[in-house]
C-alpha cells in the first residue's frame, strides 16, 4: 500500500485582518489532480477551479484556522502552527508522514514523522494542494469581511497592508477583525482610530 503523505501549508500570515488558515491534504495517487502549483503562482480563477477537485479527489483534507484573537495572544508564528496542527488533527484518514511548507515543523500531537520543505508548495503536490485550499478559504473570509465592512476594500487587498487598506483604517478606524498586534493597526489604535461597533 502507498504511504499516505499529508501536505500542509498556510495562508494569511501577512495580512492585518482576519484569521490565519492552514490546510492538510492527503492526495490519492489513483485520482491525480492536474495543474497543482503554489497557490501564489495561480490566478484566483484557477485556484477556485482546482479547490473542489482537490476536495473531491483527495483521500482526506481539512482546512482549519486560528482566530484574530489567537494571533494577537500567541503571535502570528505560533497561531500559524496552531492552525496547521488543527488541520492535521482534522483529517478523517491518519497520515503516515507529514510534509510542511517552510522551514519549521509544528508540534503535531500525532506521533508521525514530519519534515519541513522550503518552497514545498512549488515542488510537492500535496503541499501545493494544501496551499490552494488554505488560500481559497482565506479569500472566502475576505469576501465575507468585504460584505460586512464596506469601505475597507477587503475584496481587493485581502487584508494585506496595502496603502489603500492602511488609509481605510486611518479614515474609518480599527475593526474587531483587525490584528491589534500588527504594527499599522497598533499605530492606528495609539492614535485613537477605533471603529464604531459593527
Swiss-Prot record:
Positions annotated to bind a divalent metal cation: 9-10, 101
Domain of life: Bacteria
GO biological process assignments: DNA replication, removal of RNA primer; mismatch repair
Membrane-traversing stretches: none
Catalytic activity: Endonucleolytic cleavage to 5'-phosphomonoester
Cofactor binding comment, as recorded: Manganese or magnesium. Binds 1 divalent metal ion per monomer in the absence of substrate. May bind a second metal ion after substrate binding.
InterPro entries: RNase_HII, RNase_HII/HIII, RNase_HII/HIII_dom, RNaseH-like_sf, RNaseH_sf
Keyword Nuclease: yes
A GO cellular-component term linked to this record: ribonuclease H2 complex
MF GO annotations: manganese ion binding; RNA binding; RNA-DNA hybrid ribonuclease activity
Pfam families registered for this protein in UniProt: RNase_HII
Cofactor: Mn(2+); Mg(2+)
Protein's cellular compartments: Cytoplasm
Signal sequence residues: none
Coiled-coil stretches noted in the UniProt entry, renumbered to this chain: none
E.C. code: 3.1.26.4
Gene3D superfamilies: Ribonuclease H-like superfamily/Ribonuclease H (3.30.420.10)
Keyword list, A-Z: Cytoplasm, Endonuclease, Hydrolase, Manganese, Metal-binding, Nuclease
RNase H type-2 domain: residues covered: 3-194
Family under the similarity heading: Belongs to the RNase HII family.
Family matches, as NCBIfam families: PRK00015.1-3 (NF000595), PRK00015.1-4 (NF000596)
Function of the molecule: Endonuclease that specifically degrades the RNA of RNA-DNA hybrids.
Name this polypeptide is given: Ribonuclease HII
Species this protein is from: Laribacter hongkongensis (strain HLHK9)
Gene: rnhB
